[in-house]
Amino acid sequence: MARARRTKRASVTDIYKGCKASGTCPPDVINKVEQNTLADKILKYGSVGVFFGGLGISTGKGTGGPTGYIPLGQGPGVRVGATPTVVRPGVIPEIIGPTELIPVDSVTPIDPAAPSIVTLTDSSAGADLLPGEVETIAEVHPVPIDNVELDTPLVSGDRHAILEVTDANPPFRRTVTRTQYHNPAFEIISESTPLIGESTPSDHVFVFEGSGGVQVGDANESIELDTFPSRYSFDIEEPTPPRRVSTPIERISQEFRTLRRALYNRRLTEQVQVRDPLFIRSPSRLVRFQFDNPVFDEEVTQIFERDVAAVEEPPDRDFLDIERLGRPILTETAEGRVRVSRLGQRASLSTRSGARVGARVHFFTDISTINAEEPIELELLGEHSGDSSVVQEPFESTILDVNIDNIPESLDTNIAETSVDYDSADLLLDNGVEDFSRSQLVIGPSDRSLPSITVPQFESPRETIVYIQDIEGNTVVYPKYEERPTIILPTPSGPAIIQSPTHSSFDYYLHPSLRRKKRKRKYL
């Protein structure tokens, strides 16, 4: 039987809001919201006779209220854990603003009783343009300084009096201002030179030749200068040895130490060196048989889902039961080589809950060292002068230079004719020696293309016998007759009957192995 699900009851506040208007609220809800329970009544009636306010009871602060703990028979209490109040003298603030300008000559205001007609003066009179002193009268109105009376508050009570003393002459604050004017006639020119050196704001001294100077020391000495070779010269330069690091800064982080401890810990991680080149290019083909996917990236962590109960033989025995193979990690060995490492996880056992248990394996392979190539002297491509040989096949015959003037006018016609017997068998003989050391032996009909087999040349005094098998046609083999011994195969026979005569009679008994075996029957 299924157990009924317990529904959550609404809060007291929600019930009070819904039932107060209709007047159907339970008494406990009304007393709870309106604070009319038994505990509330005890607090109300008890607070009439006893007052504990301001003591901070049951607040958890431990400060004794706003007045602190007061020992018996002593003065005011001390607040626990609070810093003492520091009384500082008050400083009269000053108003920061523009300074007061003192007028040089103020304009006299117009008197209301003065006439409204202004008398004009004759401007045709000659103005005084001669230089002279201009008298300036400045009226300074002193600022009245009254004695400032400071009212000190009067504090009365049973406690000690605390006086707030204020300095009558506060310290005067000085203000320093700086004004900068822009001069349009002055122009600053900043320029930089491409020369290598250091320039300081000190004065530079320039020495010019021909201005007449005094020679100090011996006569001048001519020094032969050498020209520095540029990088565009055609000289062969020795290659610079490769640098191990570009910046001598060692940055060792906690992650690197943890990773190195996980890879090279022989107690927790199995070390396996892989020599197959597929480990760098496509390591998944070493774990299981599959097709190549050109879209998949082998540089990420690979997870192989398989059934532990199923027996699957991987292409490489070192990757047996591999469930997870991490991404490649490039490190440097002590010999200076680059090592490619991958951290794998085996799934050798499986529990009933589905958890798989296996050891961690560190697969690594070292990349071979790439030696620096030897420098090769290069030649310029272009026209150059030199001897060249041109061979033409039609003119490979021998050419004789014969002087025509030395030929006699009459030729001797009495030339003995060579008698040749064309019926002789010597003409059929071929004196040429054939060499079949680089020949090819073709077996089969010539109407179709067949693979060619090259017969190598052996430096041996013995006769060379080459056996060639033709798998496309019929092969007839005529073996030599040899006398072979006749092999008599044993015929199968039953068990031998063993007789053991005990008397002179012909009685016998069967061997225990020949007796019929009794079948065991199961009785219910």
UniProtKB/Swiss-Prot annotation:
One of its GO terms (molecular function) is DNA binding. It is found in: Virion; Host nucleus; Host early endosome; Host Golgi apparatus. InterPro entries: Late_L2. Keywords: Capsid protein, Cytoplasmic inwards viral transport, Disulfide bond, DNA-binding, Host endosome, Host Golgi apparatus, Host nucleus, Host-virus interaction, Late protein, Microtubular inwards viral transport, Phosphoprotein, Viral penetration into host nucleus, Virion, Virus entry into host cell. GO terms for biological process: microtubule-dependent intracellular transport of viral material towards nucleus; symbiont entry into host cell; viral penetration into host nucleus. Pfam families: Late_protein_L2. A motif (Nuclear localization signal) lies at residues 1-10, 516-523. Highly phosphorylated. Disulfide bonds join C19-C25. GO terms for cellular component: host cell; host cell endosome; host cell Golgi apparatus; host cell nucleus; viral capsid. Transmembrane segments: none annotated. Minor protein of the capsid that localizes along the inner surface of the virion, within the central cavities beneath the L1 pentamers. Plays a role in capsid stabilization through interaction with the major capsid protein L1. Once the virion enters the host cell, L2 escorts the genomic DNA into the nucleus by promoting escape from the endosomal compartments and traffic through the host Golgi network. Interacts with major capsid protein L1. Interacts with E2; this interaction inhibits E2 transcriptional activity but not the DNA replication function E2. Interacts with host GADD45GIP1. Interacts with host HSPA8; this interaction is required for L2 nuclear translocation. Interacts with host importins KPNB2 and KPNB3. Forms a complex with importin alpha2-beta1 heterodimers via interaction with the importin alpha2 adapter. Interacts with host DYNLT1; this interaction is essential for virus intracellular transport during entry. Belongs to the papillomaviridae L2 protein family. This is Minor capsid protein L2. It comes from Human papillomavirus 22. The gene is L2.
